[in-house]
């Protein structure tokens, strides 16, 4: 069969398997996930052997040390994958939950019940742990999943998927409910994105170029997990010590993640007093500051910021800094350059905090707290499949509930419409 025919077959089988999966009880789904976790840990040696093939190929291709680190699986990371599956098993099952119920004047009882979306396609890049994480969230929420990982992790992804499918076979659950596109050619992705009759949703996880490619080529609805150009605005009433502490955490704790801080905006009324000690503190942490002309008056060691810096997701120890006239200017800047991810105001003015919350439309707006809290676990949602920057169908961290939709249920007693 051609690649197109094989991808179509995978999608058809996933669609058929999704029907059986949607009927599984919470108990069976949890048993499956717990056994999958045990199987991953039991198969640590084999998984590391397959991962070694990907690492060797990556070194030959000249992948950066950072890329190789994302690709690498060791015993600790495999245990982390297993623990993530156990965490998903511990979460409440949203499927079948009746979210609302009301009575009509004619006596009908009308409600809304959560149901799986059906078949979810995940397109992702180098981190092989996504294979297990995405599968767990989709399966727990009653969805079949079709996975297409990066070519650089093909051996690792195949081994992880095979391990999980082995448990499904043992429990009599259709293995096609967890499918991996086995091709490294781009044609495999393109054909997957054409299966609009069989796949209900595509979620791309990776860099900006991958997400743009998926959006431009998909016939299936896409939820974008786009770049994180996250901002923090130091208001005129801000507590300087608090602001500096939050900025350091948001920028330096894990600079390579999407909820790390990338742009700092400072009210002009506090620029002269806030910037010099702040710049000294960040410099001691090896953070490169890039500022506009006004910022550089108070931090002359900062590099000159260009137009490109305001829209940059650095994912490293670089921070773009700008002095703004007021909150209007700060909000305008965020609306122009932001990616709808995470935005912070540091302020002691309640009215300003409320206005910032109302007028900034990102997926998470924070007052006096780090951007790093825009995370499913930190917000109390449990595991997440990613942070959506698309307002339809979900916005912000996507947990189990966000992988479902609702249907109307109606209870009658013989009513007919007049």
Swiss-Prot record:
One of its GO terms (cellular component) is cytoplasm. GO terms for molecular function: glutamate-5-semialdehyde dehydrogenase activity; NADP binding. GO terms for biological process: L-proline biosynthetic process. It catalyses: L-glutamate 5-semialdehyde + phosphate + NADP(+) = L-glutamyl 5-phosphate + NADPH + H(+). Keywords: Amino-acid biosynthesis, Cytoplasm, NADP, Oxidoreductase, Proline biosynthesis. Coiled coil: none annotated. Pathway: Amino-acid biosynthesis; L-proline biosynthesis; L-glutamate 5-semialdehyde from L-glutamate: step 2/2. Transmembrane segments: none annotated. Gene3D superfamilies: Aldehyde Dehydrogenase, Chain A, domain 1, Aldehyde Dehydrogenase, Chain A, domain 2. Its main location: cytoplasm. InterPro entries: Ald_DH/histidinol_DH, Ald_DH_C, Ald_DH_N, Aldehyde_DH_dom, G-glutamylP_reductase_CS, Glu-5-SA_DH, GPR_dom. The keyword NADP applies. It comes from the Bacteria. Belongs to the gamma-glutamyl phosphate reductase family. Catalyzes the NADPH-dependent reduction of L-glutamate 5-phosphate into L-glutamate 5-semialdehyde and phosphate. The product spontaneously undergoes cyclization to form 1-pyrroline-5-carboxylate. HAMAP family: ProA (MF_00412). This is Gamma-glutamyl phosphate reductase.
